[in-house]
Amino acid sequence: MFGKRKDSKNKAMRDNEELTPWERQQLLREENIEKKQKKSKKILVSSNLVKFNGLRKRRLQKRVITLASIFGISAIISLYAILPVSRVSNIEIEGTDSQTKTAIIEASQVKKNESLFAVVPTKFLIRQRIKNDVATVKDVNISLKKNVVKFKVTEYDIVGYIQRKNTYYKLTSNGRELNVGQKATNGNYPLFLDFKKKTLLHEAAQQVGEMPKKVRFGISEIHSSPTKVNPKRVRLVMNDGNEVIGSIDTLATKMSYYPSMAKALGKKGVIDLEVGAYAYPYBK
């Protein structure tokens, strides 16, 4: 075996000896190039391996950081959820009376000791429930201060009351009726009486809402007094002792003439605004 290797080596040496100097130089050059290529491949493979290991390490670190962050945030939320500060401690309402406050709390469905996580994401729905269920609320702003829920209310004008049995319900300028009643009226608002149809009641309330406040506050009672000719006929009892006959659909416009007509009448009487406008004293 060793003899064969020696013979091969001797043969290669003899072959080299038979080459010209230029050919030997070319052969050496090719051998050097081949060695450099092999070395370059080794370096490239080694470099790629280092890059792959580095990329793998960075991905692993990123995954560990992500998981740690998720677990950390979950732990903080879980801890916060069991603390008293995460629950509603109080409910404050600004811009309305005690009766409407009760209605707002009921409509909001927000309760003391309820989790704030149930309140914050549903603020829009709470606002819509209040506006839909509480007739006097025109708009409501909901905010949180620490763990106190605050409602800042903007209301429609109150234009009067409707009596049902022994309970009085507020009527608003948009023609709606508050669903929470009270045992007595308050404020200088007229009482709506004898209205059998809610559509006429709400239309009358809207008309009163369009009147100047000075005229509106001069009305004591508004009676539905329909006839076959005019189902929208109403009779108004004024605080100054006069009576006004009118029609719901033109009430706001024609009542603007009332102050000057009452002054021209000179004594207590009836001002008829149903068709045209004229007045006569009671003793006529």
UniProtKB/Swiss-Prot annotation:
Residues 1-63 are cytoplasmic. Keywords: Cell cycle, Cell division, Cell membrane, Membrane, Transmembrane, Transmembrane helix. Residues 86-156 form the POTRA domain. GO terms for biological process: FtsZ-dependent cytokinesis. The keyword Cell division applies. Coiled coil: none annotated. This is Cell division protein DivIB. It comes from Ligilactobacillus salivarius (strain CECT 5713).
